[in-house]
Amino acid sequence: MTLSLEQLSARMRQGEDVPLSDTARIALALSIPSILEQLVVTAMEYIDAAMVGHIGAEATAAIGIVSSSTWLLHGILVGLYTAFSIQIAQYLGADRQQDARGVLRQSMLFNLILGLGAAAFGVGISRFLPGWLGADISLQASSSAYFAIWSAALPFTMAMGMYTAMLRATGDALTPSLISLLVCALDVVFNFFLINPTRQILLFGQSVTVWGAGLEVPGAALGTALSTAIGGLLALGVLLLRDGPLCIRKPGSWRITSACLRNLWRVGTPLAAERAALSSAQVLLVRIVSGLGTVAIAANSLGVSAEGLCYMAGYGIQDASIALIGQAVGAHRRDMAKRFAWLCTMMGIGIMALSGVGLWLFAPALMGIFTADAAVIALGAQVLRIEAFAEPMFGASIVASGAMQGAGDSTGCFVLNLFSMWGVRLTLAFLLAPRLGLVGVWAAMCIELCIRGALFLIRLARGKWLDKGALQ
């Protein structure tokens, strides 16, 4: 019988020696739903890309131009709310349930303030952003509308991400995956009606008129926004109604505490800076790619979506590692934190190695899901096969960084990611793009990911990431 995370935490606090088989089972029990959740999230991205891609390469390029900016803005917010889930994991590991509920309440206030502020900022710059990024004049109107709608939904996007992260910190990885599954299904339905115009379809041999808004690119953003809003409200509802260590119906204060602010600064600031550094580098990469033509822009955007099929497993295991290492550190069990870190990292490397093989074999078919443009498919398949060789080391960096974040060592992750992304990838892409085009940009990415994975494995082996100690 698999231990629950709550039972494991109790045994760790008592100083018991938990068998490796038990730790492996609980790591799998938390990882599998998280991997499935990442699969659903990636499927939602595939749906958007495929439905828009079949409109034409211009529509795909319109989204691709602003995609790196969505990563930048969302990434900063993810860094901040991940800091809240790390605090909760460590407090639950130390059996400080009242403190964990206090952090949850404070996170809800931060979510409201930051979400509304980010939405206002994104909508405000949406009119000018495509031009800043060098988009062709023919793409700017649809790119601007897409980014404005996406930005307006940020409070709900943050709510879904933050509250599902809280649930995972308690050891409940199943509920977030079910919420994500529903969100994906709703996204399909909304996109079906919002992207396409009113049209005739064959249903059981009969021609049926189906209403459609015909919004094209903005319709994809609106469908995702509506489905994510429902997901965020559902996650909040679970936290409001369910009994358990994070039940906020139990008495407690909504006051923002100095301890929470200190921990948010210590963990959240480097995480947000890391996300900003990675995403702003992606913005510069898109700026480099935007000068290579519409086919290269579309192939790059769809290639990134296709590659998501590979690294979703890594991010699913990363979610589990944050919860596991966070609770082990909270229970003051360095030995268990190390065990979980290496166990999860090896799982990530192994699964992403298999994913890389699949990516190399099925690259043309994956690109064909998103577009019928032969030139885009050919170029996209070529760069995906380059990227396939980096997947195992990319998995190492993803999961090892999650382990370090769970221990509160977000500064170390920031430094390694900053060096590899800005010192290696951008430099190589700048040098190779004029000579090799999009192939050069993705070759730079492959080299950088291998270097990044090696750096994270070295830091994991040295063990200094555990020196931060438990949060106050």
Question: Which sequence ranges carry the predicted segments?
Answer:
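Alpha-helical transmembrane segments of multipass membrane proteins
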Residues: Y46-A50, F128, M162-M166, V188-F193, ...
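Short alpha-helical transmembrane segments in multi-pass integral membrane proteins
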Residues: M1-S34, I88-P155, L186, P197-T269, ...
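N-terminal transmembrane alpha-helices
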Residues: V18-A50, H54-I55, S68-Q87, L112-A119, ...
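Small-residue-rich hydrophobic transmembrane alpha-helices
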Residues: T60-A120, T157-P176, V286, A299-V357, ...
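Hydrophobic alpha-helical membrane segments of integral membrane proteins
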Residues: T175-I179, L222, V415-L416, A443-A444
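Transmembrane helical elements of multi-pass membrane transporters/channels
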Residues: A29-D48, I149, M160, S227-G231, ...
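Helix-terminus/linker motif at the lipid-water interface of multi-pass membrane proteins
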Residues: L39-A61, P130-I137, F193-P197, S207-L215, ...
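Small-residue-enriched core segments of transmembrane alpha-helices in multipass membrane transport
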Residues: S180-D187, S305-G308, L418-T427
